[in-house]
A protein has these predicted regions:
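Helicase P-loop NTPase motor core
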Residues: 1-93, 118-120
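Residue-level "edge-of-site" marker
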Residues: 14, 100, 311-312
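Structured loop/turn residues at secondary-structure junctions
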Residues: 46, 75, 99-100, 222, ...
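Conserved helicase C-terminal RecA-like lobe
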Residues: 66, 80-89, 105, 112-323
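Conserved RecA-like helicase motor-core motifs
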Residues: 91-101
Length: 323
């Protein structure tokens, strides 16, 4: 292929110059490994139910396959956030390729700092994370500001924060959320509205993509009635074992990162417009063709079993619900 590409005539003509050489009927070729022996397309009403269905299917597949022989593929890294949470809750270990886990993403840590401080005003790491979003605030300044806040003296707080009015505004915003409790999803929505200008400033090159990832967090919160339980579950880490070489984990991967790899069982999620194919691909024919090629790559990663998940509706924060 490297020599002749896809030109069959060149290959055939060149073959006669290499003796001894035979030409065999392609139909006589019998591959050693069979193609996918089972596959299914599963439609679910909403994409937030998809994670539960996928976890259930993975638990079934683990009866027949080792964890490292199972993979879940998706178009973009943030598409797996809900699944990561569900896998953590189920105690299913996983490793991820292509994009950070939601617990590692900087913008997610930024947003969750507000929520953690809302639940616990004395959460020093959360306060430090929120303060770090502002220019000119180092560790020593954080310590002084935190001490003033912890003492609860309004005059001392005003004085300590005089040089940092934007951070003081953040603190007042958190206080306002604490004074008027809302559902977890509504709370996260409010935090995102407050944080968005800073998101655009801190991450000017890719803030729209990060915004989409944060909207996934809001959708995850919609399944909870208690904010503290949501935060506790979000903080769960995938179980790890000492000396783990990855064989004891299911693989989560973007399609791009999966090129050249194969698994016995493959599950492809979020097969719906605006996810896979992506939003931008729908506007240009050439981009849509690239999505078709990616879909081919994704499907051909499966050796034995292929499951396709098609949500009937996607959560849209802009629409305040599903669309």
């Amino acid at each position: 292929y490297k020599l002749f590409g896809v030109n069959a005539e060149l290959l055939i003509d060149h073959a006669w110059g290499w003796e001894p050489c035979t030409i065999a009927d392609v139909k006589a070729y019998k591959p050693e490994n069979k193609s996918v022996v089972s596959g299914q397309v599963l439609q679910n009403p909403y994409n937030f139910e998809q994670a539960r269905l996928v976890v259930r299917r993975i638990e079934e597949l683990l009866q027949e396959h080792l964890p490292h022989e199972i993979a879940v593929l998706f178009r973009a890294g943030f598409h797996s956030y809900q699944l990561e949470l569900a896998l953590n809750q189920a105690g299913v270990a996983f490793r991820k390729y292509g994009g950070l886990r939601y617990t590692e993403a900087a913008h997610v840590k930024d947003v969750m700092a507000y929520v953690r401080l809302l639940l616990n005003p004395l959460d020093l790491p959360a306060f430090a994370r929120m303060a770090a979003q502002h220019h000119g605030i180092g560790p020593k300044t954080v310590e002084k500001l935190y001490t003033a806040t912890a003492r609860g003296d309004a005059k001392n707080v005003e004085k300590a924060f005089a040089r940092f009015p934007a951070l003081l505004e953040d603190m007042r915003f958190v206080d306002s959320l604490r004074a008027a409790p809302q559902t977890p999803a509504a709370t996260l929505n409010a935090v995102l509205e407050h944080y968005r200008p800073r998101l655009e400033t801190l991450y000017p090159e890719d803030w729209p993509r990060r915004q989409q990832g944060l909207e996934e967090i809001v959708q995850m919160a919609s399944a909870y009635t208690e904010l503290d339980l949501f935060v506790a579950d979000l903080a769960l880490e995938s179980p790890e074992e000492e000396g783990d070489d990855g064989e004891g984990r299911v693989t989560l991967s973007t399609v791009h990162s999966a090129k050249g790899l194969e698994w016995n069982a493959v599950l492809i999620i979020d097969l719906v417009e605006d996810r896979f194919p992506s939003r931008h691909a729908l506007a240009r024919p050439e981009d849509f063709e690239e999505e078709r090629r990616l879909m081919y790559v994704a499907c051909t990663r499966a050796r034995q079993s292929l499951d396709l998940y098609v949500p009937a509706a996607l959560y849209s924060r802009a629409e305040r619900g599903n669309q």
